[in-house]
């Protein structure tokens, strides 16, 4: 398997895990609204994973994706995982606004 495909798949796994961390952080914040150190970390984790997925997907050859199922699939899963990480980060932003919290590094 090509290195670029492996990178895209690894980035997708990381983004999916980051999205799960964001969901867990939101659930924690519903119970304990002062636990923003976890929410902040999950937000930045999602953004970093999103960027990694986008970069890995961009590194794949679009012409090769037309004929190589591995490349096509890697591009697809990286794109979907990037979007999920983005969506979960946005959910944390919405919660932060609702609770009058500023997400910090």
Where are these regions (language model features)?
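Long, low-complexity or tandemly repetitive, helically biased scaffold regions used
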Residues: 1-105
């Amino acid at each position: 398997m090509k290195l670029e495909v492996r990178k895209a798949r690894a980035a997708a796994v990381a983004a999916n895990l980051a999205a799960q961390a964001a969901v867990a952080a939101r659930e924690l914040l519903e119970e304990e609204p002062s636990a923003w150190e976890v929410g902040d970390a999950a937000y930045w984790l999602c953004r970093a994973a999103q960027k990694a997925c986008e970069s890995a997907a961009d590194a794949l050859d679009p012409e090769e994706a037309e004929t190589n199922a591995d490349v096509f699939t890697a591009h697809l899963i990286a794109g979907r995982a990037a979007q999920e990480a983005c969506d979960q980060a946005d959910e944390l932003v919405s919660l932060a606004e609702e609770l009058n919290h500023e997400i910090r590094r």
